[in-house]
């Protein structure tokens, strides 16, 4: 029974009802004059303009009362829809009175729209389409589209003009009282208020029969008020509120990232989720995360309540709830069981690729920070300097199963973008394994021979040997599964104590790893074995020291283990490698002191030499022998060279045991340029305009910079910071557009019998190899059988996967070009086939039907986008070198098929370059190409760098000079395949 049923409010005469109608009851404003809807008038293309076949500009003049439009010409010498000025209108009205009719404002537009005969227009347009070409045709097609749409939807064109404005419910445009008696209100209320005020004033003026010009002005103001309400700022200056801030109109409420759709409908906040700071959890297994107890209680609350009631620890749900709030002892007992086997999802923003969300099994930890496994930080691009992550609980059984099967972190060892391991040890773990596998000549106990690994461990524990000691071990002591040859098993293997310990973490039947080379994966090289009884000291005296295992090699080991043993074994190995690394890096006691930053004796001499060279160049400039540009170019070259010399000398002077060198050499942290800045010189700095300042910073951080040097350095540092902020936004937007176009490319079938493929060869940039042939064919299917050119034997047959061995064989046979199945030539409807796509990089297996490869590709281009800098790069300081757009802007340029900056001319014919004539007066040169049928001449700027000389043969579609090609031109001259291949090549650079 509703208490207030049927009662009517005595103040306002509205029936009393529940307050939620404030969110659903609309009102409306009846306008005293019609008003056009700005979306239909200003949207691109202007829908009103298309229906009436008038330009948006003339529409604007009519709507905002600047000119009259003829509605009925009568006998007057004017056309229908012609624009006339005020003066002309009065003249015509006087002369042709009765039949002549013209008007202005939305009323006139409404009448014109009402007069449109849609069916007639449609037939007219269809006739026109048969002969029209070019722009006319495009316009006709657009008009036909809209006319058809009106006919099919039964909407009338005159409805684009409004007589009534709807008012949204009051709770959707709230007004709240602030402290101090002021009110805060939604912008919409202001906008509605302006409409109401102007509308009422217009009504009053009409009742008073005010002069036409005043009414006209008021109608225009009403039109503008309604425009601002619907889409503020679309036309003219936006209406501003207090503090000159543009008011948010109805359109803005829906638009963009902060609008209704993306913010609240696609991006809701969800229940059973939380976020917290992350911290490192070295004690975790690969598929675990540490969940703080207070978070766990909150996230799993309904599960705990259910469990408490089923175990009869609480009488009903309400008492269970009370128990949880009191943090009863029972709750903790139940919690352990509830979270067991219940995976949770962890996400770190920005989620750049699919590894930004992974599933883990929670383990309860104390404190308030979530603990993350150190190896997955790479995939999340997370660090522990205060990063936060979000956690989500999958509720239904299906969701849990999906998280467990598809998203467990242990299964995501390879990155989907290139198939290389993304969970590789970093920092401490790297330095630990590096330290462990280092060898040193002459350490204590060198040349001892052990009967087995355990004996070596005992010797180490008793301080007889060190990890770095080079020792021998009887090969026969290894388990039978270890791949040694029979000959090797009868000998003694020379290795180091640390390597014996390192190899214990590898699978039993994995080869013993004794040197950081890929060949070692096939088995240990015979050169590490000596006969039992041979003197090991002689052997050690002659044999050079083997390098330690660096970060890249650890990654190779992981990839190899993954290839052989798949997920489970690899994740176990990763955990063992992590624990070993942490343990040994702790034992190594690696420290850094000021004394580790060594002084370079030769530095003053190198600097003096450079200063002298600069003085010489300056002298030449003063005498007028060289231009200012040349002087600047040479000075910067001299200093760059000086810095390089210092860098080389520094590397020579390093002790291999220098901790800073070890950090950098192992790949744990830092690179050579950090070190050069500490111990060498900082070198040339970029100025505020991006131009290099020719005064170098000769000091390093150890000596300390002068005030002047410090000041010069700040430009570059500041630019770096602002670049980073800008490029993140750009890259995110690029990824979003890429995903948008590629998301429906899915693997639909196994094979589509396509008879076309793509011939691939190594991608070159000038003379340097960007991507070798091996990388391009690996994991793809051959289109044609490939034969060895020497022996003629078949290496791979058609539609067979090219795996590592086949790819090596092809490269070793000296074959430079292979035709492979490709997604470019796929004939599958709405997607691609398994044979076209090849191997799924994330799993190393052939791709499954149903894999969303388009999205994976989009994310793989978008994710490194953040790493690409915004910088535009000068070509090695060569005067006249074109400014080549690099990094992110270049990728965007390719993807959007824009006309690139500094583009190259391309040849439209295949033939021979017959002449290159320079014309200094116009700063151009003409290149003539003689084809089989016709001859073409191209005009290039004088400074353009040529790719062909006279007499060279040229193919159609080749660039004549250096620079990027415009993809649209290339497409016109050649076929889709060439263009696709060109775009692919460019992006890979």
From Swiss-Prot:
Pfam families: RNA_pol_Rpb1_1 (PF04997), RNA_pol_Rpb1_2 (PF00623), RNA_pol_Rpb1_3 (PF04983), RNA_pol_Rpb1_4 (PF05000), RNA_pol_Rpb1_5 (PF04998)
Known EC number: 2.7.7.6
Enzyme class: transferase
Keywords of this entry: DNA-directed RNA polymerase, Magnesium, Metal-binding, Nucleotidyltransferase, Transcription, Transferase
Superkingdom: Bacteria
Gene3D superfamilies: 1.10.132.30, 1.10.1790.20, 1.10.40.90, 2.40.40.20, 2.40.50.100, RNA polymerase II, clamp domain (4.10.860.120), RNA polymerase Rpb1, domain 3 (1.10.274.100)
CDD domains: RNAP_beta'_N
An annotated GO BP: DNA-templated transcription
Molecular function GO labels: DNA binding; DNA-directed RNA polymerase activity; metal ion binding
Details of cofactor binding: Binds 1 Mg(2+) ion per subunit.
Cofactor requirements of the protein: Mg(2+)
Residues the entry annotates as binding Mg(2+): 383, 385, 387
Catalytic activity: RNA(n) + a ribonucleoside 5'-triphosphate = RNA(n+1) + diphosphate
Annotated InterPro entries: DNA-dir_RpoC_beta_prime, DNA-dir_RpoC_beta_prime_bact, RNA_pol_asu, RNA_pol_N, RNA_pol_Rpb1_1, RNA_pol_Rpb1_3, RNA_pol_Rpb1_3_sf, RNA_pol_Rpb1_4
GO CC annotations on file: DNA-directed RNA polymerase complex
Assembly and interaction partners: The RNAP catalytic core consists of 2 alpha, 1 beta, 1 beta' and 1 omega subunit. When a sigma factor is associated with the core the holoenzyme is formed, which can initiate transcription.
Protein role: DNA-dependent RNA polymerase catalyzes the transcription of DNA into RNA using the four ribonucleoside triphosphates as substrates.
Family: Belongs to the RNA polymerase beta' chain family.
Protein name: DNA-directed RNA polymerase subunit beta'
Species this protein is from: Leuconostoc pseudomesenteroides
Upper taxonomic lineage: Bacteria, Bacillati, Bacillota, Bacilli, Lactobacillales
């Amino acid at each position: 029974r509703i208490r207030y049923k049927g009662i009517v409010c005595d103040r306002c005469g509205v029936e009393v009802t529940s307050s939620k109608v404030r969110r659903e009851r609309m009102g409306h404003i009846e306008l005293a004059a019609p008003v056009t809807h700005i979306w239909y008038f200003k949207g691109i293309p202007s829908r009103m303009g298309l229906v009436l076949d008038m330009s948006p500009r003339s529409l604007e003049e009519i709507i905002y009362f600047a000119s009259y439009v003829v509605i009925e010409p009568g006998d007057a010498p004017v056309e229908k829809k012609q624009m006339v000025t005020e003066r002309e209108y009065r003249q015509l009205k006087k002369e042709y009175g009765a039949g002549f009719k013209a008007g202005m404002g939305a009323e006139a537009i409404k009448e014109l729209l009402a007069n449109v005969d849609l069916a007639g227009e449609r037939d007219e347009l269809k006739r026109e389409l048969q002969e029209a070409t070019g722009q006319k045709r495009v316009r006709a097609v657009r008009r036909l589209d809209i006319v058809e749409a009106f006919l099919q939807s039964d909407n009338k064109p005159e409805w684009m003009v409004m007589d009534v404005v709807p008012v949204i419910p009051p709770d959707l445009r709230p007004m709240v009282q602030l402290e101090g008696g002021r009110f805060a209100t939604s912008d919409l209320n202001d906008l509605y208020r302006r409409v109401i005020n102007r509308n009422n004033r217009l009504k009053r003026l009409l009742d008073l029969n005010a002069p036409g010009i005043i009414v006209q002005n008021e109608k225009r103001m009403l039109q503008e008020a309604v425009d601002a309400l619907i889409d503020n700022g679309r036309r003219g200056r936006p209406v501003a509120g207090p503090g000159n801030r543009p008011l948010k109109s109805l359109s803005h409420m829906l638009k963009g990232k902060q609008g209704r759709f993306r913010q609240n409908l696609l991006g809701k906040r969800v229940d059973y989720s939380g976020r917290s700071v992350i911290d490192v959890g070295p004690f975790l297994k690969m598929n675990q995360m540490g969940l703080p107890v207070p978070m766990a209680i909150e996230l799993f609350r309904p599960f705990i309540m259910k469990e408490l009631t089923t175990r009869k620890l609480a009488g009903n749900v309400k008492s269970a709830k009370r128990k949880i709030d009191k943090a009863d002892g029972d709750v903790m007992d139940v919690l352990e069981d509830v979270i067991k086997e219940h995976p949770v999802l962890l996400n770190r923003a920005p989620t750049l690729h699919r590894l930004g969300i992974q599933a883990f099994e929670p383990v309860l930890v104390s404190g308030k920070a979530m603990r993350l496994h150190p190896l997955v930080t790479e995939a999340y691009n997370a660090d522990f300097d205060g990063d936060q992550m979000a956690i989500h609980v999958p509720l239904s059984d299906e969701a849990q199963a999906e998280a467990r099967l598809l998203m467990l972190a242990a299964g995501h060892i390879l990155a989907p973008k290139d198939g290389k391991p993304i969970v590789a040890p970093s920092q401490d773990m790297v330095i630990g394994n590096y330290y462990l596998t280092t060898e040193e000549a002459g350490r204590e106990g060198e040349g001892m021979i052990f009967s087995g690994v355990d004996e070596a461990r005992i010797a180490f524990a008793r301080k007889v040997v060190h990890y770095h000691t080079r020792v021998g071990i009887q090969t026969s002591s290894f388990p039978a599964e270890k791949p040694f040859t029979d000959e090797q098993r009868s000998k003694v293997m020379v290795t180091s104590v640390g390597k014996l310990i390192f190899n214990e973490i590898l699978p039993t039947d994995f080869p013993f790893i004794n040197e950081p080379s890929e060949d070692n994966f096939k088995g240990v090289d015979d050169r590490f074995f000596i006969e039992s009884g041979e003197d090991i000291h002689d052997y050690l005296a002659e044999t050079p020291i083997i390098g330690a295992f660096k970060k890249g090699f650890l990654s190779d080991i992981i990839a190899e283990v993954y290839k052989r043993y798949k997920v489970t074994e690899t994740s176990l190995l990763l955990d063992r490698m992590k624990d070993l690394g942490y343990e040994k890096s702790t034992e190594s006691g690696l420290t850094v002191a000021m004394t580790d930053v060594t002084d370079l004796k030769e530095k003053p001499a190198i600097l003096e030499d450079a200063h002298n060279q600069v003085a010489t160049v300056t002298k030449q400039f003063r005498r007028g022998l060289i231009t200012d540009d040349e002087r600047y170019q040479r000075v910067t070259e001299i200093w760059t060279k000086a810095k390089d010399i210092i860098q080389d000398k520094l590397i020579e002077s390093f002790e291999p045991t220098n901790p800073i060198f070890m950090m950098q050499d192992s790949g744990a942290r830092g690179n050579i340029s950090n070190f050069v800045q500490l111990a060498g010189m900082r070198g040339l700095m970029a100025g505020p305009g991006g131009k290099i300042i020719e005064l170098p910073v000769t000091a390093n951080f150890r000596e300390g910079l002068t005030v002047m040097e410090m000041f010069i350095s700040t430009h570059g540092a500041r630019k770096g910071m602002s670049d980073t902020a800008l490029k993140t936004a750009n890259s995110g937007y690029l990824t979003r557009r890429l995903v948008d176009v590629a998301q429906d490319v899915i693997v639909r079938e196994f094979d589509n019998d396509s008879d076309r493929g793509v011939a691939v060869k190594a991608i070159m940039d000038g003379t340097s190899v960007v991507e070798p042939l091996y990388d391009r064919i690996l994991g793809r299917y051959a289109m044609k059988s490939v034969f060895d050119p020497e022996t003629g034997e078949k290496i791979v047959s058609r539609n067979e996967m090219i795996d590592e061995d086949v790819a090596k064989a092809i490269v070793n046979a000296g074959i430079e070009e292979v035709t492979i199945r490709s997604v470019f030539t796929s004939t599958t409807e709405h997607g691609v086939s398994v044979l076209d796509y090849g191997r799924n990089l994330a799993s190393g297996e052939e791709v499954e039907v149903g894999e969303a490869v388009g999205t994976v590709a989009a994310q793989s281009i978008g994710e490194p986008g953040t790493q690409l800098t915004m910088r535009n790069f000068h070509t090695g300081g060569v005067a006249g070198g074109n400014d080549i757009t690099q990094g992110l802007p270049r990728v965007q340029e390719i993807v959007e098929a824009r006309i690139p900056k500094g583009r190259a001319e391309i040849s439209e014919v295949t033939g021979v370059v017959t002449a290159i004539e320079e014309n200094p007066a116009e700063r151009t040169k003409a290149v003539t190409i003689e084809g089989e049928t016709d001859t073409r001449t191209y005009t290039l700027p004088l400074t353009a760098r040529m790719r062909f000389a006279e007499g060279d043969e040229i193919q159609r579609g080749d660039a004549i000079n250096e620079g990027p090609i415009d993809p649209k031109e290339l497409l016109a001259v050649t076929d889709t395949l060439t263009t696709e291949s060109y775009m692919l090549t460019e992006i890979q650079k």
